From Swiss-Prot:
The record marks E152 as: Transition state stabilizer. Keywords: Cytoplasm, Pyridoxine biosynthesis, Transferase. It comes from Wolbachia pipientis subsp. Culex pipiens (strain wPip). Homooctamer; tetramer of dimers. Transmembrane segments: none annotated. The gene is pdxJ. One of its GO terms (molecular function) is pyridoxine 5'-phosphate synthase activity. This is Pyridoxine 5'-phosphate synthase. One of its GO terms (cellular component) is cytosol. One of its GO terms (biological process) is pyridoxine biosynthetic process.
Length: 235
């Protein structure tokens, strides 16, 4: 199973003092050296953590794949075409939220998403969609004229209050996505304990993990916690 490390909150710490440190690029290189398979950053419309220059700097200077999380806006899609990351992950976004609160509403967006996927593919950029583990939403993937390359299952509800029922929803969703011939990832709120359970689910090929790793890194160092998480999901 692959590990994507989200380094947004390195930038959060930097921006808290309006400083030039800690440097997200330095964090990215440490995570890669410790075993991260790819890097993820979320360029939000309010630039609360990652900034435009961070994204360009990462793309130019890291040795692994860059996954850029963005809202489906003209501004963000334009930036994606300029940066040309390995992949983009389309996420819903509200200015007032502390973090992404849920998955995309495919029911209301399927026609728009088809156009985005086609456009990004013309720039050789893979497209991921961030979706709740809800079969009723996932069914609308079949209505898309152009299929995404990846679906990332939103694991926040499970991680906030784990239960077998919620884990089953993720399992069923991963199976459904796999049957559509789409690669399945998972992310949001995952720590070591959650990772041990989610890694058992068939068809999930990668986890995106950020806040818990950056939090643990305060006490144990980013190299150490990234290496530990990679070992956790690889066993």
């Amino acid at each position: 199973m692959k590990l994507g490390v989200n380094i947004d909150h390195v930038a959060t710490l930097r921006n808290a003092r309006g400083a030039s440190y800690p440097d997200p690029l330095k964090a990215a290189k440490i995570a890669i050296n410790a075993g991260a398979d790819f890097l993820t950053v979320h360029l939000r419309e309010d630039r609360r953590h990652i900034r435009d220059e961070d994204v360009f700097n990462l793309k130019q200077n890291i040795s692994t794949e860059l996954n850029l999380e963005i809202a489906a806006t003209e501004e963000m899609l334009k930036i994606a075409k300029e940066v040309k990351p390995y992949s983009i992950c389309i996420v819903p976004e509200k200015r007032e939220e502390l973090t992404t609160e849920g998955g995309l509403n495919i029911v209301n967006m399927h026609s728009k998403l088809s156009g985005i996927i086609e456009e990004m593919h013309s720039f050789d950029i893979k497209v991921s969609l961030f979706i709740d583990p809800n079969i009723n939403q996932l069914k609308y993937l079949e209505k898309l004229e152009r299929k995404p390359d990846i679906i990332e299952i939103h694991t926040g509800d499970y991680c906030d209050n784990p239960s077998e029922e919620k884990l089953k929803l993720i399992t069923n969703s991963a199976e459904y996505i796999n049957n559509l011939g789409i690669e399945c990832h998972a992310g949001h709120g995952i720590n070591y304990k959650h990772a041990k359970e989610i890694k058992k689910i068939p068809h999930i090929s990668a986890l995106n993990i950020g806040h818990s790793l950056i939090s643990e890194a305060i006490f144990h160092g980013l190299h150490s916690v990234t290496k530990k998480m990679k070992m956790t999901i690889s066993k």
